[in-house]
A protein has these predicted regions:
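Helix-biased "structured C-terminal domain" signature
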Residues: 2-419
Length: 419
């Protein structure tokens, strides 16, 4: 369960933050440092092999390698050879992590896989101790200051959240207006260390929305797309095997996607691609891999404004999931997950219902943009139109590391396990 904090945190008035009347009068136009960095970000995708990044993976590796020791990352393991497929998958080991000691990464090249694993480990390091000073206020008090409903955040089941509950809140940024906002610290500080005190179930804390990037805009798009991905998977979890939503593997697929499916086929994989694009109109895909010799039925999903990037992410994540099972090194895969994923009823349902797939890749939406900031603006606007609330982000960047790391929350979107 997410950690709490002591009662010594100051309130808003103690720290000199404006009250509700001032915010209402000024239209909450207080912008944040994160927003200033975003508005100054003119970066554009310069690397586009299955992904869209501001610089090449090799350049990112040069930037982050000097930081690994300070973050406690002791090893980068290549686990690609444990499977038959051959797509690069790496694991970054951080023994003193307060949540997961093993972070995974995947890609179409070795450099992509290495960057993916190392950046995930660095993200975990950044979220264990949030640098911003928090304030302590009740939910009811904060509701009058916020442009979103705290009850629309991911809640525990059951949740004892009420207006009288005091919480620690950290500064955040409204991604539509740039206005200063607040989010519960419990949601974005991931620390599973056990303390000698009781924590009442309130929120469902997870790494969903935690993201990094070469630039602020790149990191924010990554985080928001991850939140949307989980929303799409949860929203259509009951209909994931609906043949009407399956993508036909035909000539309409881009060449890169055909090459990936050919690689999987040569490894003996049965592949099913499901179009889960949700009400925001962003492309989201779910990919299922099955092999007669196991180890299990595995799934991967991906969401991105560019539909090819979304599909590539789903495929590579499914491959990564297989290696998570095979390597057996993840702290978050208990024995029952292995058992359930190999249940004949699950595998049979997938094979039977996917046989009639008839949806085409070209039917999935796609969004084009030349720079990260306008692309983010478009995605934020779509979420805001659907939920009636703007996504918010916490700036987790540390001056001594210099890497853009953010935690994105989108009140009103669904957070449900895809399993």
């Amino acid at each position: 369960m997410a950690r709490g904090s002591n009662n010594s945190r100051p309130g808003l008035s103690t720290l000199g933050y404006p009250g509700p009347s001032v915010l209402a009068r000024e239209g909450a136009l207080l912008t944040t440092h994160l927003w200033q960095k975003l508005t100054a970000d003119t970066s554009a995708p310069r690397y586009s092999f299955g992904t869209l990044r501001a610089v090449t993976p090799t350049a990112t590796l040069r930037r982050i390698r000097p930081l690994l020791r300070a973050a406690g990352i002791t090893r980068l393991a290549d686990v690609t050879g444990l499977d038959w497929i051959g797509l690069p998958v790496f694991q970054a080991i951080r023994p003193n992590s307060r949540v997961l000691t093993v972070s995974q990464g995947k890609g179409l090249t070795r450099a992509q896989g290495q960057v993916s694993a190392l950046m995930e480990a660095l993200e975990g390091f950044h979220t264990e101790e949030i640098p911003q000073r928090s304030v302590r206020e009740t939910v009811g008090t904060m509701r009058r200051r916020l442009a979103y409903d705290p009850y629309a955040l991911p809640l525990a089941r059951p949740s004892f959240l009420s207006d009288t509950v005091p919480l620690d809140w950290v500064p955040a940024t409204d991604l539509w207006s740039g206005a200063a906002s607040w989010v519960p610290r419990q949601l974005c500080e991931l620390n599973a260390c056990v303390e000698d005190r009781l924590y009442v179930p309130l929120f469902r804390a997870s790494s969903n929305g935690l993201a990094s990037g070469n630039t602020v805009g790149e990191a924010l798009i990554h985080g928001l797309c991850e939140v949307l991905e989980r929303d799409c998977c949860g929203r259509y979890s009951e209909a994931r095997f609906d043949p009407e939503r399956c993508v036909v593997r035909d000539s309409a697929l881009p060449r890169l996607a055909q090459r990936l499916l050919g690689l999987l086929s040569r490894a003996g994989m049965q592949t099913r691609i499901v179009d889960l694009s949700g009400p925001t109109g962003l492309p989201c895909f779910e990919v299922w891999l099955d092999h007669p010799d196991g180890p299990a039925l595995t799934q991967g999903s991906g969401c991105h404004p560019n539909r090819l990037t979304a599909l590539v992410r789903a495929v590579t994540e499914a491959v990564q999931s297989r290696l998570a099972y095979i390597s057996g090194s993840r702290d978050d895969i208990p024995r029952h997950v292995y058992r359930d994923s190999m249940a004949p009823s699950v595998v049979g349902s997938l094979r039977r219902k996917s046989a009639e797939a008839r949806r085409h890749f070209r039917d999935a939406p796609t969004v084009r943009a030349t720079r990260f900031s306008p692309q983010l603006r478009d995605v934020v606007g779509r979420v805001r139109s659907f939920t009636g609330m703007s996504p918010v982000a916490v700036d987790l960047a540390r001056p001594d590391f210099g890497i853009p790391v953010v935690f994105v929350l989108a009140p009103g979107l669904v957070l449900t396990d895809a399993q």
